[in-house]
Regions:
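Active-site metal-binding loops of divalent metal-dependent hydrolases
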Residues: 2-5, 42-44, 73-74, 108-109, ...
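Binuclear metal-dependent phosphoesterase catalytic core
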Residues: 13-16, 172-174, 191-248
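His/acidic metal-ligating clusters that form di-metal
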Residues: 25-38, 119-199, 236-237
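Metal-dependent catalytic neighborhoods of phosphoester/phosphodiester hydrolases
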Residues: 40-61, 76-91, 156-158, 191-196
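Short, electropositive alpha-helical surface patch
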Residues: 51-66, 157-171, 198-206
Length: 248
């Protein structure tokens, strides 16, 4: 899942109750069987408040499913990675082996030069992050890479504020046949593309969805959702599950 955009006290944003949407996603997952892990590709919070991380941590804990999170541009790196110590979900730096697959989480967030408490909308993977990824890929396990910013253009007006050094990222992973899947968020839109030996997939937002074919920043009501990723041997199947919220 991605882009929860929780706010302190559950205050609506974009005329949307994102907390209600997150609660719904938790209920949907609770009804599933045999879930090995939950991966959140950024923007747990919309305002960076500790309240939002505590709330997410409590609901993820109620599921009892291992949960891994990387930051998004709306998250507070200071709160998420330094000040708040979640009791359940795991944050960067992090990689883990899940049933023989290596899950590698990366930080693509760029802090604002003028205000370190704010982040830029576009993304960038530091040399340290790329080297960390290479180190983990050298271990040879079939691998899933998770980050917030898209390394591929999704089309339409969503072709903006992507991963700045996506060419470098894509060139590196093209050299490693064990990279099977790259998952990300930020665009609030579901995509599923096979490029060479790598499948690229973005998750529609839990908070509020967009659509490349709609006007810029128009909410795509009813398309909020999560992705169910099923891996059997080397076969990867991804289903986008909509949370079924629509305006009256």
């Amino acid at each position: 899942m991605s882009d929860l955009h929780l706010t302190r006290g559950g205050c609506p944003i974009w005329e949307t109750n994102t907390m209600e949407h997150f609660n719904r996603s938790i209920d949907v997952i609770r009804g599933m069987k045999d879930i090995d892990a939950i991966v959140v590709t950024g923007d747990i919070s919309n305002d960076g408040s500790e309240w939002t991380y505590k709330y997410a941590d409590r609901l993820f804990s109620s599921l009892g499913i291992p949960t891994f999170c990387c930051p998004g541009n709306h998250d507070s790196l200071k709160v998420m990675l330094e000040e708040y110590n979640p009791s359940f979900f795991k944050v960067l730096p992090q990689s883990c082996i899940i049933d023989g697959w290596n899950l590698i989480l990366l930080n693509s967030v760029i802090q604002d030069d003028e205000d370190p408490n704010q982040n830029k909308a576009r993304g960038f993977l530091s040399e340290a992050s790329l080297n960390y990824m290479i180190q983990k890929l050298e271990e040879g396990f079939p691998s899933i890479i998770a980050l917030h910013h898209p390394p591929l253009e999704p089309g339409g007006w969503l072709n903006r504020k992507l991963l700045d050094n996506r060419d470098d990222f894509n060139k590196i992973i093209s050299l490693y046949d064990n990279v099977k899947l790259v998952i990300y968020g930020h665009i609030h839109y579901f995509t599923n593309v096979l490029k060479g030996h790598v499948r690229y997939c973005s998750s529609s937002s839990v908070g509020f969805a967009f659509d490349k074919d709609l006007p810029k920043f128009q909410i795509a009501d009813g398309y909020e959702g999560i992705n169910l990723i099923e891996i059997i041997n080397d076969s990867i199947t991804i289903n986008n599950i909509q949370l079924s919220f629509r305006s009256n």
